[in-house]
Amino acid sequence: QRRRQRQMCIRDSTKIVQKFKNRKFHITPFVSDCGLSYGAAAFGASLWHDVKVPSNLAFLGRRYLTPLEIREENLDLKKVAQYLEDGKIVAWYRGRSEFGPRALGNRSILMSPKYKENKDILNEKVKHREEWRPFAGVILKDHLQDYFEEGIESPYMLYSQTVKEDKRDKIPAITHVDNTCRIQTVESGFLSLLLEEYYKISGVPVLLNTSFNDNGKPIVETPQDAIDSFLNMNIDYLVMNNTIIGKN
């Protein structure tokens, strides 16, 4: 209001974004109590400076060195994509951790969305949670309009969007009973490259994306957290930065 900008800064639903299509929306990825610290910092900064939102806003965790016993190499994304197409469960650990409640591709568990039973497998054998709970997805941004009615770009996975009728049988593992899905859009980075490889193999530019943790436990933070969780959960592969780790 001070600068007479016709913009809104809110935390609200997909319907509001659709209704006010001519307005610009800034919804932070911190849609839980942890957002209070960001709000206080942003407000304080605005009193003395012009606030510039950094591009890596969602990834404010520490950066860790890979354990010395793990040898870094060039990551074979084609191999990882084939694992996913074969129905394997892949834990994905890269860079700085997410700040907020959503797994956005740095501390994620990934699986193919093509098979309805994958939802039950993850709920029962991996996450150990109620069978009715849905899973989110991640999609290449260029294909968003092909799969979702609203087609709202969402790099922070903030909106539940309606899966188009002709696509519901292609991604049943992430299509909820009301035909919606909370979807994340990506257009760059390693997760985007993995999606491109998966799309070449499967014809589907979407993956199931859920947080890398067991039920009742926090999302993994350190490399040691990731290794411990990988060994104690029913996960087939751990991709840690540029290294693929399997189980004997």
Model feature map: region roles:
Residues Q1-I10:
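Single conserved hydrophobic/aromatic residue that forms the stacking wall/gate
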